[in-house]
Amino acid sequence: ICDHCGLINYENPKIVAGVVAVWEDKILMCKRAIEPRIGFWTLPAGFMENRETIAEGAAREAHEEACADVEIDALLGVYNVARISQVQIFYRAKLKSPDIAVGPESAEVELFSWDEIPWDSLAFPSVYWALHHFQETKDQALFAPFSEPDDWSQTPGFEALAARYKDD
């Protein structure tokens, strides 16, 4: 609270909106062209903008990062990443066409089958979680949204996240 004017400057968590978007049996992924984790593979996702719904933000990120038009299907997961003050929300989505292209934040975009996913080069633990939660529910019309595991220190990609955001 400002002593002079009484303004309260809230420092709240950031909301990240993303998609696991598919065309037939292939999953859309983007190789990051920006930090953090430049050169690693991720799902289309990014910070929400003012005056948009989470689903709108997720669809916008797919378009910005991979020039992809998606149809949102269902809420997949809500992942609390408290150590970096983020809530990451992913949806299942279907690509309206297989036409994708590199956006300004991506070095490459590709449609991967499950066995082709570059598991050793995933950018963040939430990408791993969302992919596995998608695989678990891809044939289900109804399911409860997932959350992060209680102990995610063994999740691939955790080491890089922990090194970048060490607790003080």
Q: Where do the protein language model's features map onto the residues?
A:
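Short, highly charged C-terminal tails/helix-capping segments
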Residues: 146-153
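Active-site donor-binding loop signature of nucleotide-sugar glycosyltransferases
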Residues: 4, 32, 45, 93, ...
